[in-house]
Amino acid sequence: MNVCYFRSLKMKKYYYLTILLIFFVPSSYAALDVTISQGKVEPTPIAITNFFGNSDKTVKGGEVLREIISNNLTNSGLFYTVDDDLYIQSDNLVDKVPRFEDWKIIKAQFLLSGDIKFIDNKYSVRIRLYDVFAGQEIKAVKMSIPNKDLLRRLGHKISDLVYERITGEGGYFDTRIVYISEVGPLNQRVKRLAIMDQDGHSDSHQFLTNGKNLVLTPRFAPNNQTITYMEYENNTPRVYIYNLKNGVREIVGDFPGMTFAPRFSPDSQKIVMSFSDPKTANTEIYLMDLNTRTINRLTNDPGIDTSPSFSPDGKKIV
């Protein structure tokens, strides 16, 4: 019994030593934990001076332009605007060379200056963009608009120019969003086709339909001048095209069955869509030329074919 007890203690001792070795002896095969953190992008500081005006209304217009440009660039996450209180030079820098050292002191990497005038019944705007550390002008543009209602659009265009010149990528500020607006109680929802600028500003919001009929699936044409969407009129779904220039709505076609999921071709000259045959209830894909209104059936099989879309080159349909 004593011998067995001694052997038992000895075995336990070896067992505990083995456990300790497993936990404390470094292994050449131990797992290597590597933590990769996301790179941090610091926003680029840009100074945007007041847009000087030659009258009360142009001064106000300049304030609107400056606010739009500043908000656009800041909201992109790639820029931040230097605080006005830090500005050392406050002159109109469109017609004179900036004192670049003054802008270096406040750590502005880029400087945007502009002015706005009302001449010959139109607003004329000039801008100059400077690279502060290089000490040189990198962009100069002159633009005009017929009325103040287009100031927001002009501000977005200037934002695009600045963004593209500095980043090398195309801007997206002069774009709009088409969507379905919903209001009212859950059992009586009113849905209207609506459009707004990409920044969602209330001044840019506009309803395109009156809400009497249900509207669905709006899509921009690549030319950004027309919208295709589906509307239930007299409980019948039809595809319509809305012209943003003149506000005219026209029906694409009065088809016998349900029509839905319209998409434009890259050149905005055709639409591909699907509609169902009321006799068979089968859904097929059709192609329509918007100039001639001719229709070609693309599919013919017992399955349900729907939600077509063009490839970027317009040669294929998925």
Give the ranges of each region predicted by the language model.
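Short beta-strand->alpha-helix linker/helix-N-cap micro-motif
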Residues: 35-99, 112
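A flexible loop/linker signature enriched in serine peptidases of the S9 family
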Residues: 170, 182-192, 210-213, 230-239, ...
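Hydrophobic beta-strand positions that form the internal "hydrophobic ladder"
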Residues: 177, 227, 268-271, 314-318
